[in-house]
Amino acid sequence: MKSLRQIFLIVVISLNNNVFSSEDDKTFQEQSMLSVLYAQTAAEFSANNIQVYNNAKIYLDMALIDKSWTAALEQKFEYSSKKPAIILDIDETVLDNTPFQARTIIKGLSYPNGWVDWANEGQATAVAGVSDFLEYANKKGVKIFYVTNRIH
């Protein structure tokens, strides 16, 4: 009789876990939808990105003036003769992938499903403010490096 109760308890817990995870998935999808809608439509989101890249210009100018400054803490020896550089991640730093995120929500999918197809479409647009910043850095003679996990 004791083992029958244990089996019953295990079945009830298992069923509850499935209900909760299904509800959790729905809640996650709803939260994801709200964040994507905000990123795609809120003027504040775009303005914040522009402000970040405008501030990056200020800090870039400060770094170019101060020859002893480096963002690479592992650089311990003479590096002032090296060409200045910046490193940016591509996705969500340079390229806006919220259309991909919206697509996955509509289809009830999640990353990485459809990611390679999205990347190959080449439909991502620039994050607000980044193009101006990269042009600014390039005019200052700064080498630009991009980091990505995209398949080439």
Please report, for each region that a protein language model flagged, where it lies by residue:
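Active-site neighborhood of HAD-like aspartate-dependent phosphohydrolases
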Residues: K83, V94-A128, D132, K139
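Sec/Tat-exported extracytoplasmic proteins
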Residues: A56, L60-K67, V94, T98, ...
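Hydrophobic h-region of N-terminal signal peptides that target proteins for export
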Residues: V11-F20
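Substrate-recognition element of Asp-dependent hydrolases with the DxDx(T/V) motif
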Residues: E92, V130-H152
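Sec-dependent signal peptide recognition
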Residues: K2-I10
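Second-shell loop/turn segments in exported
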Residues: Y38-A47, V116-A124, F145-I151
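Solvent-exposed, polar/charged alpha-helical surfaces in well-ordered, non-transmembrane soluble domains
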Residues: N54, I58, A128-E135
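Non-catalytic pre-domain segments flanking phosphatase-related domains
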Residues: V19-L88
